[in-house]
Amino acid sequence: MASWPPLELQSSNQSQLFPQNATACDNAPEAWDLLHRVLPTFIISICSFGLLGNLFVLLVFLLPRRRLNVAEIYLANLAASDLVFVLGLPFWAENIWNQFNWPFGALLCRGINGVIKANLFISIFLVVAISQDRYCLLVHPMASRRRQRRRQARVTCVLIWVVGGLLSIPTFLLRSIQAVPDLNITACILLLPHEAWHFARIVELNILAFLLPLAAIVFFNYHILASLRGREEVSRTRCGGRKDSKTTALILTLVVAFLVCWAPYHFFAFLEFLFQVQAIRGCFWEDFIDLGLQLANFLAFTNSSLNPVIYVFVGRLFRTKVWELYKQCTPKSLAPISSSHRKEIFQLFWRN
């Protein structure tokens, strides 16, 4: 096949790596040319927004002199995971600009792909953990103790990072630099030692990294929404009820955005597996899967830069924390500005 997505979808067959020259099915050369021109710029844009946005989120969470609550612990870890992920994207942008001739050596070939694979697991496991915490808080509030939940959140995040790292070890070990004489390049490819690895990889990718977490996410959030609808009055009377509702709205938005960004990737990954085992055949499916994988990969990438935008526009409490951080960092010698004076300043600023 022709797919060349960075998220470890390559076959060990070299003839499946490059769309223009390496396959008998060449029905969409214009689409591939367009993708190769557009994708590097798109990747760099995602990297820039993701780097600045997630750094900003981490600063807002970590700079204030106070302890993080449970939701903030999970969201800070999610931002850290996204930040580590986007740091690897410029290498893939350069790889595409360089016609897939990997210029960074074998160690970075393994390391960058290992980081990308680890992020895939860490991100979705964190989303599951966030949903589970909201479920316990809203559906079983009497069983949730703040101090205990905070300790559990820290331990859970450490375990998620460790498990994500362990699950990325096969990628680190099986990625390699290999010459492709027909194209006169040296490519960073995934070398699967046996055909059985294709099945093991799709089980890991589609079931462990998506379907099982998706089932847990749907279960938790279904009961969260039912609890919010059925116990609205109770939530208002509980201490912190309004705050919990705002935090839950933010988390539900993050969950939906995550699923929208990542579901197409797993759909096309499963189609690729069906093509590899010849359950589906033909040039139409090959081109459809190859192009779909490329687009789905980079739709998934956007999630890492989309989360900070969600924090700002959906997270009302997050915006409050930004304002508190601003006041904390502003010199106390500066006199506070009255609302009327502030309005005059804004009018002068926006006046042409």
Swiss-Prot record:
Main location: membrane
Keyword Metal-binding: no
Keywords from the UniProt entry: Cell membrane, Disulfide bond, G-protein coupled receptor, Glycoprotein, Lipoprotein, Membrane, Palmitate, Receptor, Transducer, Transmembrane, Transmembrane helix
Lipid linkage positions (S-palmitoyl cysteine): C329
GO molecular function: bradykinin receptor activity; C-C chemokine binding; C-C chemokine receptor activity
Glycosylation sites: N13, N21, N184
Membrane topology annotation: Multi-pass membrane protein
Cytoplasmic compartment segments: 63-72, 132-153, 228-250, 316-352
GO biological process assignments: calcium-mediated signaling; cell chemotaxis; immune response; inflammatory response; positive regulation of cytosolic calcium ion concentration; response to mechanical stimulus
Extracellular compartment residues: 1-41, 94-110, 175-206, 272-294
Compartments it resides in: Cell membrane
TM regions (residue ranges): 42-62, 73-93, 111-131, 154-174, 207-227, 251-271, 295-315
Positions of disulphide bridges: C109-C188
Record bears the keyword Transferase: no
Pfam families reported in the protein's UniProt record: 7tm_1
Origin superkingdom: Eukaryota
InterPro entries linked to this entry: Brdyknn_1_rcpt, Brdyknn_rcpt, CCR1-9-like, GPCR_Rhodpsn, GPCR_Rhodpsn_7TM
Family from the record: Belongs to the G-protein coupled receptor 1 family. Bradykinin receptor subfamily. BDKRB1 sub-subfamily.
Record's function text: This is a receptor for bradykinin. Could be a factor in chronic pain and inflammation.
Protein name per the record: B1 bradykinin receptor
Organism: Chlorocebus aethiops (Green monkey)
